[in-house]
Amino acid sequence: MSRKYFGTDGIRGRVGQFPITPDFMLKLGWAAGMAFRKQGHCRVLVGKDTRISGYMFESALEAGLSAAGADVMLLGPMPTPAIAYLTRTFHAEAGIVISASHNPHDDNGIKFFSGSGTKLPDEVELMIEELLDQPMTVVESGKLGKVSRINDAAGRYIEFCKSSVPSSTNFEGLKIVVDCAHGATYKVAPSVFRELGAEVTVLHASPDGLNINENCGSTHIESLQAAVLVGHADLGIAFDGDGDRVLMVDHTGAIVDGDELLYIIGRDLHDRNKLQGGVVGTLMSNLGLELAFKELDIPFVRAKVGDRYVMAELLEREWLLGGENSGHVVCCNHTTTGDAIIAALQVLMALKRKGETLAQARQGVRKCPQVLINVRFEAGKSDPLQNPLVKEASDKATEAMAGRGRVLLRKSGTEPLVRVMVEGDDENQVRGHAEALAKLVAEVCA
């Protein structure tokens, strides 16, 4: 059954445009509360990132959940993975995150976590969608949900992050720059690294509700690169607005992406005989990562793009490590979802054990030239990927690379974009095919 509201990562869109409106969020809170109540007594945690609209939607969700008889525990601004962790430790039926991740402030969205801290099963999402189409009813007054606030949420999560590395860990002498993207990590990330002994310079940790992800964080890494070079830091760490993505910068200012971080963590686990199986990447993972793991005899498989698909593959195979080149890294030996702070800590521990710099560790991945071009299209128009001209051009580009590259065309699960990715061993050829395909897709979308 197809979904009406839920995308690959919850519900997301422009604030004020359906479904990202206060009245829809009220109904969504009620529908979610009714769905979770079917499993017995219902307690739901609600957290958010730092967008100004988060306060409005928090109030609407709170009212809807209460109307359904669900107790609500408010966390305030907290990273998405923190909400997953706290949902689990408070034994709540579900967790709700109000965030649009790496998108600008005028977008927002909703993600759900199950009581075990994982993404909701498909059947629960479909149940919520069915309830959204039913009239809203309010439970009798004596059964209305109560609302409370968890005041020590940040401290609990900081201690959890620190527990992901050995208790003897001391990063004294390590000089790092941390970019919090004016987002949900601003209260917790600097404390985690400082309490473990690192010297920390903090960038973009003054959210005003409007500046989240604005020319900062993992999607705009230039200021972090500059700060690392100017401050002669050992490395830089960039988070996105909700704290589930991480990219790094080495001491030379070079960007270290999710593929390379996955390699560094995977190699460390492999060296210590703690990998448990192989590593899960995605269709967008660079071919160089696959080849690097092959050299280490580490199995590597590709899931569909999206951390929920990476997680599903990990659970099915009972493996521990997976991620995306965008910086979602899932360490199942520590977390139930992508956690940027914990992933960064695993990289720092791997470097410490090996006695390497980040620049040295990343050399294990010889990345193939890869070009990604995003083409915007209007929702409701015919699917450009089903156009025979686009299919023919994609097939011809693949054939022209004669087994030395690959072409991937896909629609984003969170934005109205077609992503055109071409990868191969000849950079000029790769760029030429990518630009030609992107131009054709744009013409078809016009």
From Swiss-Prot:
Modified residues (Phosphoserine): 101
Key words of the record: Isomerase, Magnesium, Metal-binding, Phosphoprotein
Post-translational modification: Activated by phosphorylation.
E.C. numbers: 5.4.2.10
Gene Ontology cellular component list: cytosol
Binding, Mg(2+): 101, 240, 242, 244
Keyword Isomerase: yes
Protein origin, superkingdom: Bacteria
Positions of the catalytic residues: 101 (phosphoserine intermediate)
One Pfam family hit: PGM_PMM_I
Protein name: Phosphoglucosamine mutase
Gene: glmM
